[in-house]
Amino acid sequence: VGTFFYYVVINQTASGCEVNSEVSTIIINEGPTITTQPIGSDICLDGTANTLEVLTQNGVGTPTYQWYASTTNTYDLTNPIAGATNSTYDPATDTVGEIFYFVVISFEGGCSDIQSEIALVNTVPEPIATAVNPEQTICIDGQADTFTIDLVGGIGNPTYQWFSNTTNTNTGGTAIAGATNNNYDTGVLSTIGVFYYYIEVTLDGIGCDLAISDVFTVNVVQDPVIDTQPIDSQEICQ
């Protein structure tokens, strides 16, 4: 590594003449290295993934880039991404699954190509909150079974908010103060009628939509009454 200067001296023995060439300068640089590697991400379907980016130092000339995609965690050079020839790349997230990305960087001046680390972009389905046992009928002054959900898909940490509603729909309800767990108990219901509840689940992962459950319905009915009572006493023959 360094700067080196060369010239040649030409002698003509017969005439005794001598001439020097001009000086030629050769600069030998450090080999190129990648200082910033691409970083993968977990993301919900159709979200905006983190931009993959590389930065380099050393080498000769202007670097050229080619990004590659693979379904395996290997340096598979058989699938270059068309048009992906910059130092950054925005991966697609329109298909569920794992895609591995890396970039090959080329330089001038006889420098060897270098490859980035492999970055995994894991695209998962949107979250779905499914109501468990969504329809119940109880007697007045009774208490419904605890509402629970099955949450599948999505990425990140969930937060919960339960709502009550006056109609059989999972929009436009009233948030229930303090009802921020993944389950909910109504407490004792002392009014006859039909009551509606649902939950909204928010995930802090990249690109995840709000997950809203189906409606939980509780039908509160009057306690049963006996229309015909047994005869209180009878006399019969032996």
Predicted regions and their residues:
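Proline-enriched interdomain boundary motifs that mark the N-terminal boundary
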Residues: 30-37, 125-132, 223-229
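A short beta-strand segment in extracellular, disulfide-stabilized domains
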Residues: 47-57, 142-152
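Short, solvent-exposed loop/turn segments at the edges of extracellular beta-sandwich modules
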Residues: 11-17, 106-112, 202-209
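Solvent-exposed loop segments of extracellular immunoglobulin-like
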Residues: 58-69, 153-164
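Interdomain boundary/hinge segments at the C-termini of tandem beta-sandwich modules
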Residues: 24-30, 119-125, 216-222
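Short, solvent-exposed loop/linker segments at the N-terminal edge
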Residues: 41-48, 136-143, 234-238
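Extracellular recognition modules
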Residues: 5-11, 100-106, 161, 196-202
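Surface-exposed, flexible coil segments in extracellular/virion-facing regions
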Residues: 1, 69-93, 164-189
